[in-house]
Each structure stands twice: as C-alpha cells, then as structure tokens.
Amino acid sequence: MSADVKVTLVRSHIGKASSVKAVLVGMGLTKRQKSVTLKDTPEVRGMINKVRHLLKVEE
C-alpha cells in the first residue's frame, strides 16, 4: 500500500533547464504555491529528487 506525498512548488522554474520544467509539468505543478498529492512510488521520488530545490515535500 502506497502512502501519499504532498508536494508544493515554492520556487519558480523560470531560468531553469527545460528538463526541470518538464518534470514539474509531469507532476502537475504549473504555478508557484500550487500543491498536489501524489502516490509515494519510486518514479515520483525520482521526480522529486530532480527538482527538490524548488519544492516543499510533506509526507
């Protein structure tokens, strides 16, 4: 059974690599201060690790 992870975008993707923006869009984070709840899977954890400097993660 997978737990959920709440992810909030706290920094903008402007000026970052296009791959960073692609990861954020894939997670459903398009604007600052937007939060989404995702399943805690290895794939999602990998996406979070790639852009962890822009996010706030709550277990």
Curated annotation (Swiss-Prot):
It comes from the Bacteria. The keyword Ribosomal protein applies. Pfam families: Ribosomal_L30. GO terms for cellular component: cytosolic large ribosomal subunit. InterPro entries: Ribo_uL30_ferredoxin-like_sf (IPR036919), Ribosomal_uL30_bac-type (IPR005996), Ribosomal_uL30_ferredoxin-like (IPR016082). GO terms for molecular function: structural constituent of ribosome. Coiled coil: none annotated. One of its GO terms (biological process) is translation. The keyword Metal-binding does not apply. Keywords: Ribonucleoprotein, Ribosomal protein. Part of the 50S ribosomal subunit. Belongs to the universal ribosomal protein uL30 family. This is Large ribosomal subunit protein uL30. It comes from Geotalea uraniireducens (strain Rf4). The lineage of its organism: Bacteria, Pseudomonadati, Thermodesulfobacteriota, Desulfuromonadia, Geobacterales. The gene is rpmD.
